[in-house]
UniProtKB/Swiss-Prot annotation:
Belongs to the viral ORF131/RIP family. The keyword Translocase does not apply. This is Structural protein ORF131. Keywords: Virion. The keyword DNA-binding does not apply. InterPro entries: RIP_P131-like. It comes from Acidianus two-tailed virus (ATV).
């Protein structure tokens, strides 16, 4: 979601910001997974398979950890995530590895550069179509 991306096209950075909010208990469930799924979809659309896979793995971890706590029949109403679930997810080595990948400057720079190239291409196409 553009709202969470430090720079346009930085879907990994947006996911890291959402994960920081998750770790601080600022987002409930399923809100956190829905926001992450948005970043995952944007990464997939942009062709960034590694970022998409890292975000998808985290979404699955959070969803699996929340299974015993889900309110049945509450639809998409957000519910607080228990501290033990946050601790369980954040202590998982796969979570730590995925978040480190997403937070790495190399990942974020690659995403921003790709978005800039795509934006320039779109501008050139629009100019060509206008003339």
């Amino acid at each position: 979601m553009a709202k969470y991306e430090p720079k346009k096209g930085d879907y990994a950075g947006g996911a890291v910001k959402i994960l920081d909010m998750f770790e601080n208990g600022q987002l409930g469930y399923p809100e956190v997974t829905l926001k992450l799924a948005g970043e995952e979809a944007n990464a997939r659309r942009a062709g960034d398979e590694r970022t998409k896979e890292a975000i998808h793995a985290i979404v699955k971890m959070i969803s699996d950890a929340m299974k015993p706590y889900r309110n049945k029949g509450s639809g998409f109403q957000s519910q607080p995530i228990p501290g033990e679930v946050i601790a369980q997810v954040t202590s998982n080595p796969e979570y730590q590895q995925a978040k480190a990948f997403l937070a790495s400057p190399a990942t974020q720079v690659r995403n921003i550069e790709r978005e800039e190239v795509l934006s320039k291409g779109a501008k050139k196409l629009a100019q060509a179509m206008a003339s």
